[in-house]
UniProtKB/Swiss-Prot annotation:
Coiled-coil regions listed in the entry: 288-376, 759-1381
Listed GO CC annotations: cytoskeleton; cytosol; nucleus
Organism of provenance: Canis lupus familiaris (Dog)
Gene: UACA
Record-given protein name: Uveal autoantigen with coiled-coil domains and ankyrin repeats
Entry annotated with the keyword Zinc: no
Compartment list: Nucleus; Cytoplasm; Cytoplasm, Cytoskeleton
Cross-link (Glycyl lysine isopeptide (Lys-Gly) (interchain with G-Cter in SUMO2)): K1034
GO molecular function, one term: actin binding
InterPro entries per record: Ankyrin_rpt, Ankyrin_rpt-contain_sf, RAI14/UACA
Bias-annotated ranges (Basic and acidic residues): 1186-1201
Origin: domain of life: Eukaryota
Length: 1415
């Protein structure tokens, strides 16, 4: 009872609160909302940072202002996760705790939509984590529902309560299990969430997980020790909720968990006794069988693991099947809900029909009663005599007819009324016979028969219409079933098509992978052929690869089209489902119409049966009709009875009138009695009313309990339906996402297949062409080799004789010739050889002449061979030296690795020192807090000084007034003296005046003494203020030193110094002004004292004169009056001055308190001076050491700059060597040795620096240990020293980084030199081979003049080729550097957490560029 009432009241209050909160902001901000707010909202929705910052720069813009819908720009930015806009708003300044109409602040919205970066930023600005919305949910609740583990971790790290409950008593763990988020459940449990926490209905997270069928979450809860045996408020356990959810897997999990708990309890109960009994027996067996058991346990565990894996697979398959079933059941549920709604509407319609039927039944009963009355009247009329009636009788009969008319219902038709009712005046006709009455009855019968026939015809028509409608309904039902079957078939076809598309996609992916492997093989083949020299084929294959890339991109576009088609198919499926729903609704509507028609048919059939029964009754009554004689006798009897009844009616009417008058009187009396009794109540009636009210209250309470129980049941049903809808939406979303990610439409897959088949066929054709070309080229190569052999034989014959020296020199210069041009020349030479075969006879004749010339012009073969051996020996030496250099470089690399490790150790030491600094020294926040406290003190001092100034001004004004009064008194004394000179008065009155004057003098003297005391007090206060100002100045200087020593920025410290100096100067000026005013007041005081002395002397003189002379009475009285007025005036001024004095005393007391506080917080001067001197000495020592270190660091920086210049010189030298493509090994070794010596020197210097740094750190630590007893100033000085050390350390780190960069550059240059050396050696080998072949060919084919020209042409072409190759290398280097730059920038942005769409697109570009480089 109370819980249900509380729930009802809570729901009402919540609804009221929602309404109030929804209405409040609309009324508040409707008038405040302007165009700039609208622009800011639009910019926030678009995420335009520049626009947002420009609008915020204007005055009066509040980003936390709510619009008509109850949300602000700040909330929109947080919900959309735009970090830059959020930064701009936070920097501008906004109330972080502002909430929207639902009570959610920006932290709630960022957690709800899973924006972890925005959430982190808000937490950095100290946004409260425990703020709850109108549903009582914190940001952790929203993060748990949004499935965002990073935001949950952030909130927990910043102190969010894991066990916070909402209005329904649900924790974040409960909501995570409801939403089926097992990972988040585990995370919350790890963070300390209560597993067995209950909501307001005493349901645990396990119960809700079982109800919503979340197996993974239930597993997580059971693993972490959730209690299975707990019961909710209704007495249900978790297995009951698992049965409601129809999830067998969860039931099995719960059973196993409960069995394990029971087993554990039983073992706990039975364990001690069994162990006590079996201990002596078990010890021997355990020692023997321990090894066997371990082996068996391992085997069993392996078998169990395999079984569990199989079970997991089966369970996953079953889960998928169950998900499909769940989807089907949910659809059925939706249909059943629709059917239930339709049944409820039909119930309401049937109720309305029942009410109408009851009304019709009542009307039919009335009509039957009226008919019975008519038949009775007809019988009485028929049995009466035929005598004539008087006028009275006729009147009576007319009255009776009217009475019967009133009894009958107005809806009865005319043919159903009797003859007496239709024509009541027939009785008055004297010559009417029974024959005419019988004719009328027959006519009425005929009319009734015609009516019955028409009713039968109507019934037949209705039956035909009903049959027609039934047939239509059946046809519609068949159509609905057929449409359902068609839609099911279409859905199945679409599912099959999606499966086929999946298969084709997998096949296409496999084909793509095969193609990629094929492409890689082709690339390798092409690279091998490029080494041989097939540049044309390379270019053709590159073009083919580009074409293939274009086709691949087209295929990816087709895949995109296929995905779009899948989406269209999904939309079609949804349309089919909607059409099915519409058809089901139409079917239900037709069924309703059919039921209505059937009910109408039943009604009309009943009416027809009733009419037939009435007709039969009429026929039976007509058979029992009476003859005319009896009828006339009956008439006479009736007339006599009517006369008697008329008399009786007259008497009754009179009595009725009397009774009416009596009743009126009684009513009046009753009303009077009621009016009297209204004021009094009987105790019996009171008790009766009490009992009735108690009964009524009990009934109402029962009704309330029933209604509350129904309300609870309905709420549960609503919650279940809501959660079912949520689950359905999630499943639909998951299905759509799976279809989008995994499925492809049929058309797209077929197009992909076709395109891939076409590309494969084209590639096959290209491969066949390439293979044919390769075969042709191999045949040509074989021919060329054969010809080469023949030529080499001829060349060997020629070389046995002589080698010319000129050709030898030309061959040495032509070392940079390429393979491709030589092959082309070989082809041309072969052609020319074919042409010149005819000229062989001529060449034989020329051979004899050439042999003669060879002896004179060419070098012998021996010298040539000796030169060759020498060159080969030098090449071997260079190779050996290169290998030695490589080994040395490897050693250097190892040394560099060691130095890197040492650098890492130094970095760790740095981090440790930083942590020590953080632990031992004050942070910026504390410094800022101290500064704020000092500023507050300064403000309070300024306020006090302002109050003192105001009091001083008031004192000046009072002094001015006193001056004026003194002058007035002087004037009055002058007048008195003149009066005394003119007239005289008696001595007695004068003595009285004297006494008064003395009293006034005393009072004035007392006032003057009090003012003097006040002025002395003020002087002392001024001195104190001076001392306080001096102390403040000293504190300001100490603070300035602290600011300089700490990590505060220099600019801020300078600004603070300037501001404080200004304030100090202002205070000094104020003090100077006060001192000047004080000196003026002193002078004025002295003047007043002199004036007072003069006045006293004058008064004494006047007294002496008065003693000698008499004064008149009139003058004395005037003097009395004037003196009394002056005395009253002076008293009022004294009161005012006393008030001012009290105020000043209060201010002085406040200042004293301030001074005492400052004294308590401050240090005495002696100690301060001692500490200061000690610190100054230490600072001097440390500064001297720092200067030495700075000089050393400057020397090191100079050395580093020298090294950098040397490295640049080496780079330039290397570039020159690259242009020449020849490296002097001796210079290289010299530079290498120099660099090694420099590196060793730098390493030694680094070691020295590290030692010095460690020594400095030790010195600092010693100083810290000595000065731990000192106060804050000592620590501040230490901090300044360590800051300077840090600066030097940063410089050292910079120098180390420059050294490492130099080392890296040296390594890179060495690698480049090695690669170039290798290339040079390869080129030299190729050139030597080609040289030999060229020499032979030139001797064979060309005459004496032609070889020089051809060789020059060859050299030119080779140089061009070398230049083109160099350009290509430079272009590739540029591309590589650009790629590296892009890669670094995007990696940095990704590391910082800025993974926006632009960054993702850039990363895709990087991958594509990388693939392009690989290609």
């Amino acid at each position: 009872m109370p819980s249900s009432l509380l729930l009802a009241t809570r729901n009402q209050i919540l609804s009221m609160m929602n309404c109030w909160f929804s209405c409040a902001p609309k009324n508040r901000h409707a008038a405040d909302w302007n165009k700039y707010d609208d622009r800011l909202m639009k910019a926030a929705e678009r995420g335009d940072v520049e626009k947002v910052s420009s609008i915020l720069a204007k005055k009066g813009i509040n980003p936390g202002k709510l619009d008509v819908e109850g949300r602000s720009a700040f909330h929109v930015v947080a919900s959309k996760g735009n970090l830059e806009c959020l930064n701009a708003i936070l920097i501008h300044g906004v109330d972080i705790t502002t909430s929207d109409t639902a009570g959610r602040n920006a932290l709630h919205l960022a957690a709800k939509y899973g924006h972890a970066l925005c959430l982190q930023k808000l937490l950095q600005y100290n946004c409260p984590t425990e703020h709850a919305d109108l549903q009582g949910r914190t940001a952790l609740h929203d993060a748990a529902m949004a499935d965002c583990p990073s935001s949950i971790q952030l909130l927990c790290d910043h102190g969010a309560s894991v066990n916070a409950k909402d209005v329904d008593g649900r924790t974040p763990l409960v909501l995570a299990t409801q939403m089926c988020r097992p990972a988040i459940c585990q995370l919350l449990i790890d963070r300390g969430a209560e597993i067995n926490s209950r909501d307001k209905q005493n349901r645990t997270a396990l119960m809700l997980g079982c109800e919503y069928g979340c197996k993974d979450a239930v597993e997580v809860l059971l693993k972490n020790g959730a209690d299975v045996s707990l019961l909710d408020a209704l007495g249900h356990d978790s297995s009951y909720y698992a049965r409601i959810g129809d999830n067998l897997d969860i039931l099995t999990l719960l059973k196993t968990a409960s069995e394990n708990t029971n087993k554990g309890r039983e073992l706990w109960k039975k364990g001690p006794s069994l162990q006590q009994r079996n201990l002596p027996y078990m010890l021997d067996e355990v020692n023997v069988k321990s090894s066997q058991r371990e082996h068996r346990n391992i085997q069993e565990l392996e078998i169990e693991n395999e079984d569990l894996k199989d079970r997991l697979r089966k369970i996953q398959q079953e889960q998928r099947i169950l998900l499909d079933k769940v989807n089907g059941l949910q659809l059925q549920l939706n249909e059943e809900v629709m059917v239930a709604d339709d049944l409820e509407s039909e119930k309401e319609k049937l109720k309305s029909l029942l009410v109408a039927k009851e009304k019709q039944h009542e009307e039919s009963l009335r009509t039957i009663e009226s008919l019975k009355n008519r038949f009775k009247y007809f019988e009485s009329d028929h049995l009466g005599s035929g005598s004539h009636f008087s006028n009275r009788k006729e009147d009576m009969l007319l009255k009776q007819g009217q009475m019967y008319m009133t009894c009958t219902s107005p809806g009865v038709p005319a043919h159903m009324q009797s003859r007496s009712m239709l024509r009541p005046l027939e009785l008055s006709l004297p010559n009417q016979t029974s024959y005419s009455e019988n004719d009328l009855l027959k006519k009425e019968l005929e009319a009734m028969r015609t009516f019955c026939e028409s009713a039968k015809q109507d019934r037949l028509k209705l039956q035909n219409e009903l049959a027609h409608k039934v047939a239509e309904c059946k046809a519609l039902g068949l159509e609905c079933e057929r449409i359902k079957e068609d839609s099911d078939e279409q859905i199945k076809q679409l599912e099959d098509a999606l499966k086929d598309v999946q298969k084709r996609m997998y096949e296409s992916e496999g084909k793509v992978k095969q193609m990629q492997t094929h492409f890689l093989a082709l690339k390798e083949h092409l690279t091998s052929e490029a080494a041989i020299g097939n540049h044309r084929l390379m270019e053709e294959l590159k073009d083919q690869l580009k074409d293939m890339k274009a086709k691949y991109e087209g295929a990816s576009a087709e895949v995109g089209k296929l995905r779009n088609q899948i989406k269209q198919n999904e939309l079609l499926v949804e349309q089919f489902r909607r059409d099915e729903g519409k058809l089901v609704e139409e079917n239900k509507r037709l069924q309703k119409e059919l039921s209505m028609c059937e009910t109408e048919r039943d009604k009309k059939g009943r009416r027809v049966a009733e009419v037939e029964g009435q007709v039969k009754e009429l026929l039976a009554k007509l058979t029992l009709s009476v003859p005319t004689e009896k009828f006339e006798s009956m008439k006479s009897l009736l007339s006599s009875e009517v006369n008697e009844k008329v008399k009786k009616i007259g008497e009754t009417e009179r009595e009725y009138e009397k009774s009416l008058t009596e009743i009126r009187q009684l009513r009046r009396e009753l009303e009077n009695c009621k009016a009297k009794l209204a004021q009094h109540v009987k105790p019996e009636e009171h008790e009766q009313l009490k009992s009735r009210l108690e009964q009524r209250a009990g009934e109402l309470a029962k009704k309330v309990t029933e209604l509350t129980s129904k309300n609870q049941v309905l709420q549960r049903d609503v919650e279940k339906v809501y959660l079912d809808n949520k689950l359905l939406n999630q499943q639909v979303h998951n299905l759509t996402s799976e279809i989008k990610s995994h499925y492809v439409p049929l058309q797209v897959s077929e197009e992909m297949k076709k395109s891939h088949d076409v590309t494969v066929e084209e590639l096959k054709k290209q491969l066949l062409d390439v293979t044919q070309k390769c075969a042709d080229k191999q045949l040509e190569m074989e021919k060329l080799l054969l010809e080469n052999d023949s030529l080499s034989k001829n060349v060997s014959r020629l070389e046995t004789v002589f080698v010319p020296p000129e050709k030898h020199q030309k061959e040495v210069t032509a070392l940079k010739s390429s393979v491709a041009d030589l092959k082309r020349q070989l082809l041309e030479l072969n052609k020319k050889c074919g042409e010149d075969r005819e000229k062989i006879n001529a060449l034989v004749s020329e051979n004899t002449s050439l042999k003669k010339t060879l002896s004179n012009q060419y070098v012998p073969a021996k010298t040539h061979e000796e030169v060759k051996t020498a060159l080969s020996g030098t090449l071997d030496k260079t190779n050996r030296e290169l290998l030695d250099a490589k080994k040395k470089w490897e050693d250097l690399n190892q040394e560099f690795v060691k130095t890197k490790d040492e650098n890492e150790i130094l970095k760790r030491n740095l981090e440790n020192t930083q942590s020590q600094i953080k632990a031992e020294y004050i942070s910026l926040r504390e410094h800022e807090e101290k500064m704020s406290a000092i500023n507050q003190n300064m403000k309070s001092v300024q306020d006090n000084s302002a109050e003192i100034l105001a009091n001083y001004r008031k004192g000046q004004e009072e002094i001015v007034t006193l001056h004026a009064e003194i002058e007035a008194q002087k004037k009055e004394l002058d007048t008195i003296q003149e009066c005394i000179k003119l007239k005289y008065a008696p001595i007695i009155s004068f003595e009285e005046c004297e006494r008064k004057f003395k009293a006034t003098e005393k009072e004035l003297k007392e006032q003057l003494s009090e003012q003097m005391q006040k002025y002395h007090v003020r002087e002392e206060e001024a001195k104190k203020y001076k001392q306080e100002n001096d102390k403040l100045k000293k504190e300001i200087f100490t603070l300035q030193k602290d600011l300089k020593d700490k990590n505060v920025l220099i600019e801020n410290s300078h600004d603070m110094e300037r501001a404080l100096n200004r304030k100090a100067e202002e205070l000094n000026k104020q003090l100077k002004d006060l001192l000047q005013k004080y000196s003026e007041i002193k002078t004025e005081k002295e003047k007043l004292v002199d004036d007072n002395a003069r006045q006293t002397s004058e008064l004494l003189a006047a007294q002496t004169l008065l003693q000698k002379q008499h004064v008149p009475l009139e003058q004395v009285e005037t003097l009395k009056k004037s003196l009394n007025s002056t005395i009253e005036h002076l008293k009022e001024e004294l009161k005012n001055k006393q008030k001012c004095y009290e105020k000043e005393q209060q201010t002085v007391a406040k200042l004293h308190q301030m001074l005492e506080n400052q004294k308590n917080s401050s240090v005495p001067l002696g100690e301060h001076l001692r500490v200061k001197e000690a610190f100054e000495k230490e600072v001097g020592m440390i500064k001297a050491s720092l200067r030495e270190k700075e000089e050393e660091s400057q020397n090191k920086t100079e050395e580093v700059s020298k090294l950098q210049s040397e490295v640049q010189d080496t780079k330039q030298a290397l570039q020159k060597l690259e242009t020449r493509e020849v490296v002097d090994l001796s210079k290289y070794k010299a530079t290498k040795s120099d660099l090694e010596t420099q590196i060793s020197n730098l390493n030694e210097k680094l070691a020295n620096l590290n030692r010095k740094y460690e020594e400095a750190c030790e010195e600092v630590l010693r100083a810290q240990r000595k000065q731990l007893s000192a106060k804050d100033e000592k620590e501040l000085l230490h901090f300044s020293i360590e800051q300077e050390i840090k600066d030097q350390q940063e410089r050292c780190d910079k120098s180390l980084t420059t050294i490492t960069e130099l080392q890296k550059r040296i390594q890179e240059s060495a690698k480049q030199i090695e690669a170039k050396d290798n290339k040079i050696t390869e080129l030299l080998n190729d050139v030597e081979r080609l040289k030999q072949a060229l020499s032979g060919l030139s001797q064979l084919t060309s005459p004496s003049g032609s070889p020089s020209k051809r060789q020059s042409q060859l050299i030119d072409t080779l140089q061009h080729q070398v230049k083109s190759l160099q350009q290509q290398l430079a272009d590739t280097d540029r591309q590589h550097q650009e790629v590296i730059a892009i890669y670094r920038t995007h990696l940095l942005s990704a590391a910082q957490g800025h993974m926006d769409e632009d960054v993702q697109a850039a990363l895709l570009q990087i991958i594509q560029m990388r693939q392009g480089l690989v290609c």
